[in-house]
């Protein structure tokens, strides 16, 4: 799985990894998400609905992705709780809604343990500085993500960027690694190869551990 803040470049990385491994990429349902634009225009009314929508779609994607080795999932179910808790802290999701969401998530996670493959082989976390996040959000041009005249949205992005760093430190559902996409601009082929080599190395350690 790939993980990281909005705009960090994880979707690009997901495609590169899948092409490199000759497998399938499962992308976050953004373009065809009818709730996402509504959420950005009115987060207090649509925060809970958005997280339930993502959770439902993500669960279906995970079951498909775990069916074969080396499939790559763009963003994980482990991150969804982070967004939901942040929306709760912002007042967009009530405590009751948060509890309902977490109970549903727990039930889904329990069901995942029944699958032959219970967890990802590796979580690849992408990171960059906050100014680069803002630049990339502007560059990709989704109207509802733009923050020039919305300081509250920019503040939300900063809070999520900060929260992600703590989330990575605490993540323990699978082996993990961090990629600095400030250092490695994935528009450059040489950087693509360097990042893929790092991922190959980590996967090699996981799948062929040295016997002592």
Segments and roles (model prediction):
Residues 58-101:
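A basic- and aromatic-enriched beta-loop-alpha substructure that forms the phosphate/nucleotide-
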Residues 13, 17:
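Hydrophobic positions on the alpha1 helix immediately C-terminal to the Walker A/P-loop
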Residues 10:
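Conserved lysine of the Walker
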Residues 5:
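P-loop (Walker A) phosphate-binding loop of NTP-binding proteins
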């Amino acid at each position: 799985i790939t993980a990281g803040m909005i705009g960090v470049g994880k979707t690009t990385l997901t495609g590169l990894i899948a092409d490199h491994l000759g497998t399938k990429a499962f992308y976050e349902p953004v373009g065809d998400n009818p709730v996402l634009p509504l959420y950005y225009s009115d987060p207090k009314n649509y925060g809970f609905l958005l997280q339930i929508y993502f959770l439902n779609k993500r669960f279906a994607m995970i079951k498909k992705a775990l069916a074969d080795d080396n499939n790559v999932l763009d963003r994980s179910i482990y991150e969804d709780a982070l967004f939901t808790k942040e929306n709760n802290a912002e007042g967009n999701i009530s405590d009751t809604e948060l509890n309902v969401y977490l109970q549903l998530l727990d039930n889904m996670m329990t069901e995942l343990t029944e699958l032959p493959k219970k967890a990802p082989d590796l979580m690849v976390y992408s990171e960059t500085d906050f100014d680069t996040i803002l630049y990339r959000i502007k560059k990709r041009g989704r109207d509802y993500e733009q923050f020039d005249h919305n300081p509250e949205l920019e503040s939300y992005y900063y809070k999520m960027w900060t929260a992600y760093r703590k989330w990575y430190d605490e993540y323990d559902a699978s082996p993990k690694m961090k990629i600095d996409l400030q250092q490695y601009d994935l528009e450059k082929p040489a950087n693509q190869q360097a990042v893929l080599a790092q991922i190959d190395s980590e996967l090699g350690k996981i799948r062929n551990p040295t016997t002592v």
